[in-house]
Amino acid sequence: MTSSNMDIAAVDEKLGLSRNQDEVVFRLFAPGEDQVSLVLFEKYDDESGENLAMLKKSNGVWEVSVPNDKLTKYYAYSASSSGEIITPDPYSQAVVRQNHFKYPSKSIILPKDNFDWQGDEVTSAAIGDLVILEAHLRDMTVHSSSGTQKPGTYQGFVEADQRGGISHLKDMGYNAIEFLPLQEFGNIEIDYKNSELSTWNDWNPYEANHWGYMTSFFFAPEIYYGSDGVKDRGVWVGQEGRAVNEMKEMVRALHKEGISVILDVVYNHVSQYDDNPFKLINKDYYFRLDEAGEYLSHSGCGNDFKTENTMSRKMIIESLLHWMNEYHIDGFRFDLAAMIDLETVNAITAATQAVNPNIILIGEPWGGGGYNPRELADHGWASWNDHFRNSVKGRNPRENDYGFIFGKLWDGNNTEHYKKLMRGYLQSEGGHFKHPAQNVNYLESHDDNTIGDFIRMSLDKVGATEVVTRAQVAQLSSEEITIHKLAALNLLTSQGPVMIAQGQSWGRAKVIANSVGSDQNAGQLDHNSYEKDDETNWLNWDEKELNHDLVDYYRGLVAIRNKYAEIRNVDTGYRQFINGSSELSFGVNMTGENQILVLLNGDQKAVSEFSLPPGIWTILANADRADTKGLGSIEQVAEVAEQSGLILVQKE
């Protein structure tokens, strides 16, 4: 049987560890191997263990059964192709690892699951109603200003009586969180400028990957965020598998507050520097290779996972279902989704919706030179809308590439194009999406400059390579706040779900901290902080108080959006546009149970005058404040100040 036939024959096999009443069965798909053994270890740091020969089936799956009374705590595989390197199970649900860029690891045989979910289930929130906070779990609590007793951990994230973590989500009214990767990843990278190594690292003096887009194990939670997680070199971590239940406890606590949990997942490539199981076993099967057998890297991350192969697709789907069933995850954001073949995209949609019809599927619709938000929409996915992002703020302040909030129309577009973006960028109007709920609008993500730094550079507050301190830039000027508020009003009155990045609500700066002493860019504004587990990324909650005026505005806008469904998702037939006296202004009239009128003026120099539909209108938001209780009333004519907006309501 050929390898291509083997994977089809093996697709229904349950891989990894399976429990029967009296025994545990171990299975590994490795059709190219001549010999595979299961290795059982009593201790996590044992260099050798008990080897049990595995039987190779005709479909390329190796299998062995072990009676319950013969089980140990840890296991791995020894395969002919990996030499002396033992290989953890690629389906590991928990691992113990030694902190080193190669990450020697063993799989943990967890006790039978008895976690008490206390009646918790996935949330039933509709994607179009979401206000998503994109956040790094550690960044949200590790700074001393958070007041957390267990900083940087799953447990710390949901502590009561703190300023960060779950308290911040509740304070702002966010109803979803999108965590940067929580699957076990290679957070220690190759030594800096070590000539004894085969790879010369002259780009990462931090020797780290902070964000997590280097997945090592697709079924296991990240150890570093557990109560036993440390990053000290040479130390073994995760011996007890504590991260498993601690992550479940975090999800349960978030659900109790009505907050949906979305995981950022990476299936387009795997970890680069550690001994990844998929690289040690079945490299030729699981990766896209060139003619010389070397890894292709259109992802830009050292390798490209071959999602189109049957067993690759099986792993991706079973990984997603594992997080849904075992961790009650409500949705996923897919990194570089354009690199996932559409047959796999379709299979993901079918499999996840069979478990949860309301599953949230969001693609980052680019990668490897591709760009496919329209195709993802046709397969039922939502996508980040970079057209909205660029049209509102611009693309690159270093190139004087500005958008609406700076009095410009990005990329030669006109206000008619801007209106299409505000009503969901629908395929029926030449856009990407079949309906507004697929349109995830945002202004900032973990990538690139924060919108705060974008505005700082655009106003020449800070040069692109200028060295500053946080104290110099943390407090926003009135000019900066004006632009921030217009951006926030644009975002939070757009159709479909919206995403807000951590720290966005106070215009945070990413000033490169000099934590390693060898970063030549220390003190500059950072546009790619993937490697920095320091104050470059950590949220300083004092800055939230420092810029409370902008924070209050965001909080008020979120409350208005949550209260009035017309703002979030109304049929196209119930949205009409009106023009203001300025060419850089327009209004959106949305009708449902209530009539909502949003007026926007991007003009930097002129007030825009709007003739209002008949009746008395209550002001919900103006240039300074946003409040569901109202800020007075207006009729006939509205004057919208430069670089500002209004939200008006007329109850039916």
Regions found by a protein language model. Give the residues of each.
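The feature marks proteins involved in alpha-glucan
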Residues: M1-Q21, D46, K56-T153
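Structural beta-strand segments of beta-rich domains
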Residues: D22-F26
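Conserved, mostly hydrophobic/aromatic
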Residues: L28, Y77, A135, F179, ...
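C-terminal beta-strand-rich structural cap/linker in extracellular carbohydrate-active enzymes
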Residues: A30, L71-Y75, L631-E652
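Active-site-proximal helices and loops of the catalytic beta/alpha 8
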Residues: E47-N59, Y213, N325, L336-K434, ...
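Substrate-binding/active-site clefts of carbohydrate-active enzymes
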Residues: R138-V158, Q162-Y327, A337, T344-N356, ...
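Loop/helix patches that line or flank the sugar-binding groove of alpha-linked glycan CAZymes
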Residues: P436-W617
